[in-house]
Amino acid sequence: MDRHKTLAIAESCTGGLLTHRLTNISGSSQFLEAAVVAYSNKAKQKLLNIPSRILRQHGAVSKHTAAAMAQSIREIHKTDFGIGITGIAGPTGATKTKPVGLVYIALSVPAKSEARLRRGSPKAARRWRPAETLCLQCRFKGTRTHIKRQASTQALRLLKKCLSY
């Protein structure tokens, strides 16, 4: 990751696996600012300020919740990027509309116009900036462990793809 970019992560169904994989990289403290495992709805509200309205209307496993997690963790820690992951790793917890393996991965990134403005000002780089949020809906198969691994891998791919632009 570009040494001038920072990242904060909000995980739910992956239980910290994405953070674990990133912290296995020597020098990850240069870009990883913070990580939170907000497994319950109460934790999502308390640690990430996710509005109860989003959780009531869309549920903990939704693109809306994943996006709110990514945006919130980014805003709270004033980082360049924020990742939010929520889903159903199984084997229990599924419904007809939300099966085991359904995972939402959101990436909150600096808005393009803001990114250009920040380049010349180190002070501006540490302020909160407006963002765009990308969200993937994924359907993974396998055991709980496999689903968590696939979700963390997909989050890394999404971040890498975003950084390559």
Describe each region flagged by the PLM.
Residues S113-R127, A131:
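Short Gly/Ser/Thr- and charged-rich N-terminal loops/segments
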